[in-house]
Amino acid sequence: YVTNQFTAMGGLKPGLVRLLTMTGVLTTVNWAARHITSRGHLGRIRTIHFARWVFLDGKQRMVFFSNYDGTVESYMDDFINKTGFGLNAVFSNGIGYPRTNWLVLDGCQDEQKYKDFLRRHTLPTQVWYKAYLGLTAIDLERNTRIRQGLESTSLSEQEAREWAALL
């Protein structure tokens, strides 16, 4: 398949500071996803269709769901290489995550420990939904830009050239 699903679940480190940190980080990520990176990207990663974190058991555990294009190996590499600081900010609050410094440094930079951590917490996915079969996140972004160009009542010459290049 072009698109795959990833689910991981694990316990949160105990303590009020960790809970407040995790809640604050996820609130920030949610705000940024809606207001800064809302053009189909998560940071510099352009292959993610969907991502969601959900607290469980009175906020003692957490589950992460994601739909992405490519292999699980390329998915993990994208996070390490493109948004490592954000990955560390979220997952460093999880029990067993590779040690970080100042919340966002190190952690996933130890690639093997990070990948081992994810593999230990990965759950098999029984069912999931994809609205646009056969289309990657990049295809969907391009199609959105084509539609916006068709709906536009005025394009500059440069914008018209950029739009035509999408076809």
Question: What do the PLM-derived regions correspond to, one by one?
Answer:
Residues 69-105:
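An amphipathic, aromatic/His-enriched active-site/gating alpha helix that lines ligand/cofactor pockets
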Residues 1-49, 57-61, 67-72, 105-167:
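Short S/T/G/P-rich N-terminal loop/turn motif that feeds into the first structured element of a domain
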